[in-house]
Amino acid sequence: MPPELQIAAEEVTREDLVALLNEDLAREYQAVISYVVYSQTIKGPQYMNVAAELEVHAVEELAHALLIAGQIDYLGGLPLGVPKPVKISSNPKEMLQFDLDAEIETIAHYRKRVRQCEALGEFALAEHIRGILVQEQDHQISLANALGVDTPDASLPIKR
């Protein structure tokens, strides 16, 4: 495992986890907004099925946001309401690439979050995040397929 992805478990507190989950929540809000916008503005007959799939992604991302917000509350924190910035484009390939890049980042963060939850003994939360990861990886695969590219490796070095 790359050193950038290793975690000093003893350094993560519940307060840290709440802050990190709020960052994840901001990414989920970003995903909801981008999928809603892109599903309604992507043009061309080759993108009709893609638009429908993006609508499904929007609903799934909203479910993720609700789950993460509930877990933040459970941990004693306050779920925040500000999304990460949403990239807007009228170019279908750019839209899909923006979403693919965001999914890769989200997957890398959630993989790290699972380990952090387990280090704190928050095993149920880790399982919830694993469930989210399954859908995020499905999104990554469908976006890569829509772009006609191989599914990228989500094991990117990320900052906490």
What are these regions (language model features)?
Residues 1-160:
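Iron-associated oxidoreductase/ferritin-like identity signal
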